[in-house]
């Protein structure tokens, strides 16, 4: 297993939040998190607010079989809920995307968010 410390490298993330019944462009706070690249190739991201303490992303290698892609991960959260992660082990860059609420939920509680950042191996 490999452990990384990750941080959004923008002034927060960009996306949309529902306000007054409509989604409007907004900025979200920057996130920092610990991420574990597991021996099985999947990725766990620490999240103390969850009962099990983490998000688990099920990962595959993009363009399977291409040697240039073997250290890249394209992942979907284990519940297939609209949370995605792409990660490059060589340069530590990631993109996280969440888009559950706009499609599946009528409440104002969930936004559509894209985060970009970098991770450093512990």
Predicted region positions:
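A short, solvent-exposed beta-edge/loop patch
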Residues: 81-103
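Surface-exposed beta-strand edges and their flanking turn/coil or helix-capping segments
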Residues: 18-21, 90, 109-112
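Contiguous, well-ordered beta-strand patches that form the walls/edges
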Residues: 38-89, 118
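Edge beta-strand at a domain terminus
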Residues: 27, 101-122
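A short, polar/proline- and glycine-enriched secondary-structure boundary/capping micro-motif
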Residues: 16-18, 54-60, 106-108
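Short, solvent-exposed loop/hinge segments that bridge or flank secondary-structure elements
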Residues: 7-49, 82-87
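N-terminal helix-cap/turn-to-beta initiation motif at the start of protein domains
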Residues: 1-5
């Amino acid at each position: 297993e490999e452990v990384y410390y990750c941080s959004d490298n923008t002034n927060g993330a960009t996306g949309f939040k529902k306000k007054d019944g409509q989604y409007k462009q907004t900025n979200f706070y920057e996130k920092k998190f610990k991420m574990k690249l597991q021996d099985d190739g999947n990725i766990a991201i620490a999240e103390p607010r969850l009962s099990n303490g983490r998000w688990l992303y099920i990962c595959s290698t993009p363009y399977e079989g291409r040697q240039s892609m073997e250290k890249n991960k394209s992942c979907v959260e284990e519940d297939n809920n609209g949370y995605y992660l792409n990660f490059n082990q060589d340069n530590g860059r990631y993109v996280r995307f969440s888009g559950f609420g706009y499609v599946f939920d009528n409440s104002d509680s969930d936004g559509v968010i894209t985060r970009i950042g970098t991770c450093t191996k512990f």
